[in-house]
């Protein structure tokens, strides 16, 4: 938000202000094209913003390195470079907006008001409207309704379960009813998992669609791209979510393999209780552990590639429109 505001401050009077001071006509009296002059103003604003941000990043990086919170590496350097590149994109977007307001306004006072209106709409209103957009345009089922469906699925399974499916005798693991109980518990677990996983997927789609709408703002695009650059945020969450589902299968496979080796177990897998599976302890070091794997550059870039293209298109479209207007601009 601050970067976007600073970029607008550097450009809102770049044309209208110079027109008022009569320096714009003087500049164009030299052998320099309007496109070159406009692009020079645009580029100087972006570089100025990047210089300010780079100084802050450098100070923060030095503090982190001195305190030992991180060590310098190629990966860290790449993340810093990616962050600065994304910052340059959002600065370019709002610099283009600032030049646009400066070209269409008759004087610098009006261009300032127009630039502030653009900043409030694209920098504040749209990014903070995500909750309204999600609830209004992409509503999903409430958690209470999901729980009711889970309870209904449990009731249906219980009604159709064979007699004895709830019998249990912890002293006799080979009790025949334990197999029925294990089958029922497995079905209950799978039914709940299917319902909740489907609900979570609708939540993911709601979030993604809402973010697509709020991506009309370069500030939202900046957030999405910086998350990808740092390997954090929603991109990281989805990767961990998918990896945890893989780990679930690995852990279950480990337990079943452990159970098969126990001759005192009837091998009736019960996900809730150990009445019909092995009760022998397992060595801690043999249990599969979940470890978060670092995201590769491709894994970070792939989910946000469209966002990156949209941001670049944003900058080009606004600047091109500004250029067309500036070519016809009366500098007198």
Q: Across the structure, where does each feature detected by a protein language model lie?
A:
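Transmembrane alpha-helical segments and their membrane-interface loop/helix boundaries
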Residues: 1, 109-332
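Alpha-helical transmembrane segments of multi-pass membrane transport proteins
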Residues: 4, 17, 51-52, 89-90, ...
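Short helix-to-coil transition segments within interhelical loops
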Residues: 26-34
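Hydrophobic/aromatic residues in alpha-helical transmembrane segments
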Residues: 7-11, 96-97, 113, 322
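Alpha-helix N-cap/helix-start motif at helix boundaries, enriched for small hydrophobics
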Residues: 35-41, 326
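Long, hydrophobic alpha-helical segments
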Residues: 1-17, 21
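Secretory targeting signals
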Residues: 40-103, 143-169, 293
């Amino acid at each position: 938000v601050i970067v976007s505001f600073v970029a607008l401050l550097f450009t809102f009077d770049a044309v209208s202000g110079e027109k008022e001071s009569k320096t714009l006509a003087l500049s164009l009296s030299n052998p320099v094209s309007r496109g070159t002059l406009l692009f020079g103003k645009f580029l100087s604003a972006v570089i100025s913003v990047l210089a300010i941000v780079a100084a802050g990043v450098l100070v923060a990086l030095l503090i982190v390195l001195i305190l030992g919170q991180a060590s310098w590496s190629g990966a860290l350097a790449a993340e810093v470079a990616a962050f600065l590149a994304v910052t340059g994109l959002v600065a370019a977007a709002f610099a283009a907006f600032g030049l646009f307001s400066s070209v269409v306004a008759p004087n610098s006072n009006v261009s300032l008001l127009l630039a502030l209106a653009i900043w409030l709409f694209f920098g504040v209103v749209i990014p903070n409207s995500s909750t309204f957009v999600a609830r209004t345009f992409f509503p999903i089922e409430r958690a209470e309704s999901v729980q009711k469906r889970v309870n209904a699925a449990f009731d249906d399974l219980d009604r159709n379960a064979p007699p004895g499916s709830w019998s249990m005798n912890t002293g006799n693991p080979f009790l025949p009813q334990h197999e029925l109980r294990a089958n029922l518990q497995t079905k209950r677990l799978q039914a709940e998992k299917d319902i909740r996983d489907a609900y979570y997927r609708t939540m993911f789609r709601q979030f993604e669609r809402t973010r697509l709408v709020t991506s009309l703002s370069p500030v939202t695009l900046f957030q999405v791209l910086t998350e990808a650059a740092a390997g954090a945020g929603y991109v990281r969450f989805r990767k961990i979510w998918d990896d945890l589902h893989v780990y679930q299968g690995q852990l279950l496979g480990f337990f079943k393999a452990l159970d098969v080796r126990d001759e005192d177990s009837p091998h009736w897998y019960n996900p809730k209780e150990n009445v019909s599976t092995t009760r022998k302890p397992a060595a801690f070091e043999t249990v599969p552990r979940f470890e978060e794997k670092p995201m590769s550059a491709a894994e970070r870039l792939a989910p946000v590639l469209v966002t990156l293209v949209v941001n670049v298109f944003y900058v080009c479209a606004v600047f091109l429109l500004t250029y067309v207007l500036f070519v016809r601009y009366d500098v007198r």
